[in-house]
Amino acid sequence: EIGSMLVEDPDTDVVLLFLETIRDADSMRAMARRAHELGKPIIAYRLGRSRIGEKLAQSHTGALNANGASIDAFLADIGIMRVMQLEALIEASSLARRRPRTGGRRVAVMSTTGGGGGLVVDALAEGGLDIVAPDAALIDRLGRKGIAIGPSPLIDLTLAGTRADVYRVVLEEVLGSPHCDAVVAVVGSSAEYRADRAVRPILDVAPTSDKPLAVF
């Protein structure tokens, strides 16, 4: 009931759910359908993902907690986004509010660090997204600008790519490329103490594109 009220609230752009169990699947589905009609994303963090967590949720709520995989499948079916960490519930709300949902599952990942980029690629792939390598046209365009990248699913600019001018050009080209539906830019430790090398280019380029862009 509270969730449905928030969906109808004109001052609410995104609805966040902290779930222990789902007591009324029909009401949840109706709420999700109405939120979709109004263009309001719903994001959920669910307790009871492990077997012991399921038992704790049951004892705390007094309700039967369905199999975790079944709940996850139900949430996906009705269009409710799910996060795996509580902190991500807050972080994802900002992204969902500012950017429209992409129409596809193809995600390009660019990074200045192989380790950090690999971590993001793993998480996206586990979420069922397609991590796409740059196509020949993108590789050629960047090559003509003196920036060499390979056909790897992770566009790893390495330490050399922490130059602001290089990062800006690559981000602009990737956002403008039709080979992906969304982009994740990974700011690695190589730019941790020099925000101008990677963070500044992201802030400058992001407003110029309608393509969904997330930063890790």
Specify the residue positions occupied by each region the protein language model found:
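Catalytic-core regions of core metabolic enzymes
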Residues: 1-216
